[in-house]
């Protein structure tokens, strides 16, 4: 655990706060030791939330553990709407959140649109259960992520919904499209931020 304590010190020394600790691959074969380690690592980093892509069945198994640790887990959604065990539709997300008062949504607005769903109403109705958004521009009908402003996700409406209503939701740029030739991740993230800042101006 000393590695995580060292990382927290580096973050602290540079004025960086860890909001969410992302743990993916949480499957049915996750051991109790691995689950306890996940919580210990998140706490050592000073995170307030664990973010994870997993299934409803795993979320159900985690209920007694999350109650023991009393720590928030925010589940990330994908566009696997044909699998009722996935966090994908509004209904499946809410079904998972109802399992524990410690459960929240890490809503990926790009994937939500790829599932042919509209994020605005879901955010409006469930903002108290959403810790953070993965902000990406996706294409309908199970498409892919594309540069901001070129897909089907109503990004301008999303960020202004948060701004105008003062929702306590963190927005995180998720860079999932391929970098254009001659560009890099730093340049593309800056483009994404510029797009969002202009949208809220």
Regions of interest found by a model, annotated:
Residues 1-6:
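Glycine-rich, proline-tolerant flexible connector loops at the mouths of alpha/beta enzymes
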Residues 8, 14-17, 131, 192:
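A generic secondary-structure signal marking the coil-to-beta-strand transition
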Residues 10, 14-107, 113-116:
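Active-site acidic/histidine proton-transfer and metal-coordination neighborhood
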Residues 87, 94-107, 113-201:
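Histidine-acidic metal/acid-base catalytic patches
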């Amino acid at each position: 655990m000393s590695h995580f304590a060292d990382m927290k010190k580096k973050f602290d020394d540079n004025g960086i706060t860890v909001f969410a600790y992302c743990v993916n691959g949480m499957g049915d074969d996750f051991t109790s030791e691995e689950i306890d380690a996940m919580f210990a690592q998140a706490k050592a980093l000073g995170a307030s939330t664990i973010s994870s892509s997993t299934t409803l069945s795993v979320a159900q198994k985690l209920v007694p553990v999350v109650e023991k640790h009393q720590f928030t887990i925010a589940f990330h959604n994908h566009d696997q709407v044909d699998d009722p065990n996935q966090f994908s539709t509004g209904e499946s997300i809410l079904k998972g959140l109802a399992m524990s008062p410690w459960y929240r949504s890490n809503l990926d607005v790009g994937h939500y649109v790829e599932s042919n769903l509209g994020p605005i109403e879901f955010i409006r109705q469930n903002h108290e259960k959403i810790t953070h958004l993965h902000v990406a521009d996706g294409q309908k009908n199970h498409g892919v992520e594309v540069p901001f402003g070129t897909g089907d996700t109503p990004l301008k409406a999303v960020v202004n919904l948060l701004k105008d209503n003062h929702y306590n939701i963190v927005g995180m740029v998720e860079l999932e499209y391929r970098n254009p030739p001659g560009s890099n991740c730093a340049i593309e993230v800056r483009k994404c931020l510029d797009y969002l800042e202009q949208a809220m101006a």
